[in-house]
A protein has these predicted regions:
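A short, surface-exposed loop/turn module that caps and links secondary-structure elements
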Residues: 30-56
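Secondary-structure boundary motif
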Residues: 15-18, 33
Length: 89
């Protein structure tokens, strides 16, 4: 399944510190090779408005969110765990 990212995702990505962007790059590369790798904690959170929402760990304090499409995951958000918790609750 091909990953894609929204313009909002890239805007948030560019706002992250360089070390977090580097970690995100490593995690997304790992996801392409092995989406089931335990360090990703890649999981479906549920359905919202008929769309599957998925989460992946970037660091202990950062997460990324995607919507599953037929042939791809569309990554739409990346950021700190506190904001992530608010978004998924």
């Amino acid at each position: 399944m091909q990953p894609r990212a929204s313009s909002d995702f890239w805007a948030r990505y560019r706002e992250l510190p360089a070390n977090i962007r580097g970690r995100a790059d490593k995690q997304f590369a790992l996801m392409k090779d092995n989406p089931q790798h335990p360090s990703l904690q890649f999981k479906q959170l549920g359905d919202r408005r008929g769309q599957e929402i998925w989460s992946a760990r970037v660091t202990l304090k950062h997460r990324a969110l995607a919507i599953k499409r037929r042939d791809a995951f569309l990554w739409f958000w990346i950021g700190d765990h506190e904001t992530y918790d608010l978004m998924i609750s």
